[in-house]
Amino acid sequence: MAQFFKPKKKASVNTKHQSVDVVRLDHNGAGIAFVDKKPVFIEGALPGEKAIIQFIEQKKQFSRAKLIKLAQKSEKRQTPICQHYHECGGCNLQHLQHEEQIVAKNEKLQELMKKQGVSQGEMVQPIMGEELSYRRRARISLMLNKQTNQLDFGFRKKQSKAIVNVRHCPVLVQELDQHLESLFTLLNQLKGKKHLGHVELVQADNGSVLLIRHVADFNEKDQQALVNYCEERNLILYLMPEADVLNHVRGEEPFYLIDGTKIYFTPKDFIQVNRNVNEQMVEQALSWLDLNENDSVLDLFCGLGNFSLPLAKKVKTVVGIEGVDEMVQRAKLNAERNQLSNVSFYQANLEEEVSEQVWASTKFTKILLDPARAGAAGVMETVAKLKPQTVVYVSCNPATLARDSQLLIQHGFKLTRLGMLDMFPHTGHLESMALFER
């Protein structure tokens, strides 16, 4: 007899309102309560609060719940600065006082290291910048609303593809925020507005950059309107008709300064969004490395040379390794433009075996890593085998930092300093820096 597949029925969710006590924050900034010894994650709730919740997801190991109301509020709660806060998917901690965000992130960093059995050494003061007007980069989503024939212009809603219409963003630098209203008006006047993909705004040290992604060519009138708009406001304009095609239409080539070094970039390239914190981060990393003129330094995940180029001004040689070849080529050009002949850049996938690479058998006295959220598991064995005196690890994910730290410690390194970087105020994102010494 044929057997027919019967899908399992989805477990029903208990939607009855329930009162819980919030005890702490998770690493993304959600409140955690416990019901029948199982953690319940509640977006928008703070430790010390009594919350009325409604379950939206119940699994064997954990549950998620919606915050209905607060029966008891934390004294650390504040009114969010942004009118779009409860819809927009950008910030998720504006309801917590900024100084308490720092405390919570510091505690989370230490907790994750302890959980992995990593002895943390000295906990240094966090690197901080402005609480607001700190983001020098924004990606603005666009969608033609067929009912109104107007563009939805703003940021994605939380856990949704829908767009929150935004004309002011308090965490954007003022130089970019001031253009949102007029840019919305301009784009809505274009005949080809239905062919728009998204817009990116980037603040360089030599001007504001506007990138427009479009899926069909602009007619002559639309293109001239864009150029006129940028000329009136002295904006650097790029058009992107395809994902891998970038046309520089007007303005200078953008750059930012770090430690007196000009780093040129395109709006496709990764740069740190927080200028102030980035400058302090580079300064601290160079200080922790305790550099001298005879040092040879390996910079892994080097990007455009954010660390490599300032390093090259202080040591004998620097080798930078980056996975994206376009950024490697720009890093080389940046070195030439800054007349730095003692730095070399190579392309390599640092998630794969690298022991056969030429640089992997070179003697380095110091190593710096700045990997993406996935961490540097693929290259940590090589780092340890190179036996540098010092390793500085800059991390945007404390969980992978804690994991990768274990391997260095197994090879005789000690974690001597650890510090948090407040790169993204009002969000759950946690950047950190760790110093390992042999």
Swiss-Prot record:
<dbReference type="GO" id="GO:0070041">
    <property type="term" value="F:rRNA (uridine-C5-)-methyltransferase activity"/>
</dbReference>
<feature type="binding site">
    <location>
        <position position="88"/>
    </location>
    <ligand>
        <name>[4Fe-4S] cluster</name>
    </ligand>
</feature>
<keyword id="KW-0698">rRNA processing</keyword>
<keyword id="KW-0808">Transferase</keyword>
<feature type="binding site">
    <location>
        <position position="322"/>
    </location>
    <ligand>
        <name>S-adenosyl-L-methionine</name>
    </ligand>
</feature>
<keyword id="KW-0408">Iron</keyword>
<feature type="binding site">
    <location>
        <position position="169"/>
    </location>
    <ligand>
        <name>[4Fe-4S] cluster</name>
    </ligand>
</feature>
<feature type="binding site">
    <location>
        <position position="91"/>
    </location>
    <ligand>
        <name>[4Fe-4S] cluster</name>
    </ligand>
</feature>
<feature type="binding site">
    <location>
        <position position="349"/>
    </location>
    <ligand>
        <name>S-adenosyl-L-methionine</name>
    </ligand>
</feature>
<keyword id="KW-0004">4Fe-4S</keyword>
<dbReference type="InterPro" id="IPR012340">
    <property type="entry name" value="NA-bd_OB-fold"/>
</dbReference>
<feature type="binding site">
    <location>
        <position position="370"/>
    </location>
    <ligand>
        <name>S-adenosyl-L-methionine</name>
    </ligand>
</feature>
<protein>
    <recommendedName>
        <fullName>23S rRNA (uracil(1939)-C(5))-methyltransferase RlmD</fullName>
        <ecNumber>2.1.1.190</ecNumber>
    </recommendedName>
</protein>
<dbReference type="InterPro" id="IPR001566">
    <property type="entry name" value="23S_rRNA_MeTrfase_RlmD"/>
</dbReference>
<keyword id="KW-0479">Metal-binding</keyword>
<dbReference type="GO" id="GO:0051539">
    <property type="term" value="F:4 iron, 4 sulfur cluster binding"/>
</dbReference>
<keyword id="KW-0489">Methyltransferase</keyword>
<feature type="binding site">
    <location>
        <position position="82"/>
    </location>
    <ligand>
        <name>[4Fe-4S] cluster</name>
    </ligand>
</feature>
<dbReference type="InterPro" id="IPR029063">
    <property type="entry name" value="SAM-dependent_MTases_sf"/>
</dbReference>
<comment type="similarity">
    <text>Belongs to the class I-like SAM-binding methyltransferase superfamily. RNA M5U methyltransferase family. RlmD subfamily.</text>
</comment>
<dbReference type="InterPro" id="IPR002792">
    <property type="entry name" value="TRAM_dom"/>
</dbReference>
<dbReference type="GO" id="GO:0003723">
    <property type="term" value="F:RNA binding"/>
</dbReference>
<keyword id="KW-0411">Iron-sulfur</keyword>
<keyword id="KW-0949">S-adenosyl-L-methionine</keyword>
<dbReference type="GO" id="GO:0005506">
    <property type="term" value="F:iron ion binding"/>
</dbReference>
<dbReference type="Pfam" id="PF05958">
    <property type="entry name" value="tRNA_U5-meth_tr"/>
</dbReference>
<dbReference type="Pfam" id="PF01938">
    <property type="entry name" value="TRAM"/>
</dbReference>
<dbReference type="InterPro" id="IPR030390">
    <property type="entry name" value="MeTrfase_TrmA_AS"/>
</dbReference>
<dbReference type="InterPro" id="IPR010280">
    <property type="entry name" value="U5_MeTrfase_fam"/>
</dbReference>
<feature type="binding site">
    <location>
        <position position="272"/>
    </location>
    <ligand>
        <name>S-adenosyl-L-methionine</name>
    </ligand>
</feature>
<feature type="binding site">
    <location>
        <position position="306"/>
    </location>
    <ligand>
        <name>S-adenosyl-L-methionine</name>
    </ligand>
</feature>
<comment type="function">
    <text>Catalyzes the formation of 5-methyl-uridine at position 1939 (m5U1939) in 23S rRNA.</text>
</comment>
<feature type="domain" description="TRAM">
    <location>
        <begin position="10"/>
        <end position="69"/>
    </location>
</feature>
<dbReference type="InterPro" id="IPR030391">
    <property type="entry name" value="MeTrfase_TrmA_CS"/>
</dbReference>
<dbReference type="GO" id="GO:0070475">
    <property type="term" value="P:rRNA base methylation"/>
</dbReference>
<feature type="binding site">
    <location>
        <position position="301"/>
    </location>
    <ligand>
        <name>S-adenosyl-L-methionine</name>
    </ligand>
</feature>
<feature type="active site" description="Nucleophile">
    <location>
        <position position="396"/>
    </location>
</feature>
